[in-house]
Amino acid sequence: KLANFLGSTVHDVEMTMDVVPHHPYKLRPAAYSVAAAKAVALLKEAGCEVGLQTVASTYNSSYVDALSVFAWACANSVDNWSILRFFPSGRGAAYPEATMTDAQCEAYVHMVQEMVASLPVGHKPEVDFHYLMPGHKKYTSVCRCVRHSIGILPNGDVVACFWALDSSTGAVDPKFLLGNVKGNSLLEILNGEKARYWSDCEHCCELGSGSAPERSVA
């Protein structure tokens, strides 16, 4: 019923699949990919465009893992494959070793690009790399906090970056906490001094930074 409802109300739906179904993966709950696979079939049948999202980490960055997910997406008529960079935030804060370096990300991007170009299949999903993944034309190190995105947590906290969360899903640093919608409107929060720290100046990612890097007024 939910798939039919979505099919009549939204254009596309995206789900996370870091590894193929039934393949163990320590960064996700058991059967996570199995549930995504079931949803893909139901949503395609309901007429939705369907995308898969893979969060690339040191635990799933091998050629075999990438090829398996891409081949599954091809075989199941997935429309889009998005590849994001892993950040040790939220539940992932317990796995800092899963974080890939810029060089590892760039090598992974090139590997996937070559794999997609060379795989002889009839249907291929569009492949979209996250802007913080070096090695492709959309890559930029410029932070998008507040200027392009924010996060709103279940308790009403508004954070400048939805990756800036600790293992208890609180802001990793006070500078990322902009306010709470229980006490102020979202417009008031986004016009506030803490938000202007991010919106008034262009700067690079400050996740894991003990001090603010050089910033420039844009």
What are these language model-derived features?
Residues 22, 59, 89-90, 165-168:
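Flexible, glycine-rich phosphate/dinucleotide-binding loops
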Residues 157-158, 162-218:
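Flexible mid-to-C-terminal extensions adjoining Fe-S/redox cofactors in radical SAM and related proteins
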Residues 24-27, 92-96, 171-172:
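Short acidic, glycine/proline-rich loop/turn micro-motifs
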Residues 1, 62-63, 93, 134-143, ...:
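Short, solvent-exposed polar/charged micro-motifs at secondary-structure junctions
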Residues 1-85:
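Radical SAM/AdoMet-radical enzyme domain recognition
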Residues 24-27, 100, 143, 178-181:
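Short clusters of hydrophobic/aromatic residues that line enzyme substrate/ligand-binding pockets
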Residues 37, 67, 106-113, 187:
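Generic alpha-helical structural signal
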Residues 49, 86-164:
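A C-terminal junction/extension of Radical SAM enzymes
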